[in-house]
Amino acid sequence: MSFGSEHYLCASSSYRKVFGDGSRLSSRLSGAGGSGSFRSQSLSRSNVASSAACSSASSLGLGLAYRRSPASDGLDLSQAAARTNEYKIIRTNEKEQLQGLNDRFAVFIEKVHQLETQNRALEAELAALRQRHAEPSRVGELFQRELRDLRAQLEEASSARAQALLERDGLAEEVQRLRARCEEESRGREGAERALKAQQRDVDGATLARLDLEKKVESLLDELAFVRQVHDEEVAELLATLQASSQAAAEVDVAVAKPDLSSALREIRAQYESLAAKNLQSAEEWYKSKFANLNEQAARSTEAIRASREEIHEYRRQLQARTIEIEGLRGANESLERQILELEERHSAEVASYQDNIGQLENDLRNTKSEMARHLREYQDLLNVKMALDIEIAAYRKLLEGEETRFSTSGLSISGLNPLPNPSYLLPPRILSSTTSKGSATGLSLKKEEEEEEASKIASKKTSQIGESFEEILEETVISTKKTEKSNIEETTISSQKI
């Protein structure tokens, strides 16, 4: 008894060392990766060590029992040899079992490796499918982002174009204002030139008048000298006539008329001298006044000429400044017009490139949408296949559960639980045995026929119940699959709408 218990404990301990509990075995199976062969070798070595330990323990037990044999005197050498032979057989069997278990464990590890590789491949395929499903949304986000950037650039270009147009309009208004001012200045210049010409004509007239006056003064001086000469000659003639008349009178009455003639001559001389002095003084005063007036007019004319010359010079300087400013504004306007043309050309080129990009992105979006629809159709087909498989699995599971519950509750045989509608397969073994021994007695045959009818009724009821339960299970699974399909379709439509 002690040897058997020890051997059982050693076998169980070695089995536990090999397989462990359920959780340990599952953890080892799930954690087995690329080092599966190494683990199998280590486990085989540990199993061999455990078997060696068990053999040593059993040998110790035999040794103790053999040592006890002289005390008990009940165990002989034949029994010991039989036990050693039995132990050798058990040990060889145990080694074979351990080797077989190690082989099975290696097969299980290889299968786990295969399943892990398949699982990784399926996970990679699932990740690729998810990435493909997520790519349209990413492409849509990229498309929307690029479209927003293009719209922002388009708005910036339009705002820059509007700003350039406003600047161009402002510069055009400034040019128009400067042109109007230039025309006004040119009109003022023409008026100043006309006034200058008029003043020059006045100056010329004044100079001519001065020359005429100078000539008149000269002629008057000459005339005054001639008048003086004529006056002197007349005075001389008068004196001569007076002398002649005085001589003639002297001949008549020299004594009486001599004082009267001298006084009369003195009076006449005084009158002529006073008249000549008055004429000379009046001529000098008129000449002086006329000369002063001419000098004043000449001074005024020279001042006006100088002012008009300064004004003309100022007008010329302003005109040159305005012409320079107009030329600069004209150059700025031309440069701005060139910039506007360049901006319009660049804007049109950018708009064309953006439209090309938008068309390409729309084509990519349509392609991704079509690919997404194809993937959705494939996913829907796979989902339909999965739901059909789930329906079948659920139906078989419900059938198996129903069979197990009926088998556990009732003591019927498995043949009575056959869901086939043929009643000939639903007969119990005792009915078949009774049909074979039907020719023994007529009473027994009738009784057996009644039992067969009852059994067939029971079997038909059971088959009808199984069929009803199967139909109920199918209806439940169909309803659940329809609900899941509807929810999946709604999710896919929502995701497609979001995309």
Curated annotation (Swiss-Prot):
Posttranslational modification: O-glycosylated.
SUPFAM superfamilies: Intermediate filament protein, coiled coil region, Myosin rod fragments
CC annotations in GO: cytoplasmic ribonucleoprotein granule; intermediate filament; neurofilament; postsynaptic intermediate filament cytoskeleton; Schaffer collateral - CA1 synapse
Gene Ontology biological process terms, A to Z: cell differentiation; cellular response to leukemia inhibitory factor; intermediate filament organization; nervous system development; neurofilament cytoskeleton organization; postsynaptic modulation of chemical synaptic transmission
Taxonomic superkingdom: Eukaryota
Pfam families hit by this protein: Filament (PF00038), Filament_head (PF04732)
Bias type Polar residues, positions: 432-443
Stretches the record annotates as Coil 1A: 88-129
PANTHER family, A to Z: ALPHA-INTERNEXIN, GLIAL FIBRILLARY ACIDIC PROTEIN
Physiological role: Class-IV neuronal intermediate filament that is able to self-assemble. It is involved in the morphogenesis of neurons. It may form an independent structural network without the involvement of other neurofilaments or it may cooperate with NEFL to form the filamentous backbone to which NEFM and NEFH attach to form the cross-bridges. May also cooperate with the neuronal intermediate filament protein PRPH to form filamentous networks.
Full protein name: Alpha-internexin
Lineage, highest ranks first: Eukaryota, Metazoa, Chordata, Craniata, Vertebrata
Gene for this chain: INA
